[in-house]
Amino acid sequence: MRGLRSGALGAVLLAIAAAAPAVAQVRFSLGGGGTLPVGTFDDVAGTGWHGMAAIGFQPADFPVGFQVDGMYHRFGFEAEAIDADWQMIQGTANIVFAFNRSEERKFHLYLIGGVGGYNVKAVGDDAEGADSDTNFGVNAGAGLDFGLGNLAAFVEGRYHAIFGGTVDPETLDDATASFVPITIGIRFGGGS
């Protein structure tokens, strides 16, 4: 029964995206890829992976749109003796600036940036009883849509900075956790 409901919901969402007027297009995105920690976060976390889901609104004849997305990240601890991973769940609200969205072009460059909440927690055998920590962060990046009518493939890279999201291993003070997810995915509702 649950699978039937999920399938019906997916069909309804695709129908809405396909039937939306040319004036504005609702877009649904799914993707995933690798996540690279940078700065002091790179001292405590190894390269990870992520999955992403998003919903966006992009007017057809206006370059500025809006996207809300959620990501799940998993990083290994840099110290090999620790049997644990960093788990991160984030939700962000973003402004999207799309360059030259004419229907004749199949490739569309865009800039994306916004703010959000990031929950970080250590998980695994050596992290039992670890507390989670939720902090504010910002992100900015760029991507490329490969449009195929109401379906598009995309590749995107963003720099994220979580204020107070990690600990400086030298001073043990709170530090900004920075990372760059590289996402490859599909978009329903128009890439062109």
Regions found by a protein language model. Name each.
Residues 1-26, 191-192:
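Cleavable N-terminal export/targeting peptides
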Residues 24-26, 45-51, 85-91, 107, ...:
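Residues that define the transmembrane beta-barrel architecture of outer-membrane proteins
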Residues 26-42:
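Short N-terminal segments immediately surrounding and downstream of signal-peptide cleavage
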Residues 26-28, 61-66, 150-153, 192:
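Repeated loop/turn-to-beta-strand initiation elements of outer-membrane beta-barrel proteins
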Residues 30-34, 68-72, 111-117, 142-144, ...:
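Transmembrane beta-barrel strands of outer-membrane/channel proteins
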Residues 40-47, 76-84, 121-130, 134-136, ...:
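Outer-membrane beta-barrel translocator domains and adjoining extracellular loop/strand segments
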Residues 54-125, 180-182, 187-191:
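Gram-negative (and chloroplast) outer-membrane scaffold detector with strong preference
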Residues 74-79, 86-88, 146-192:
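Predominantly the C-terminal beta-signal and adjacent terminal strand-loop region
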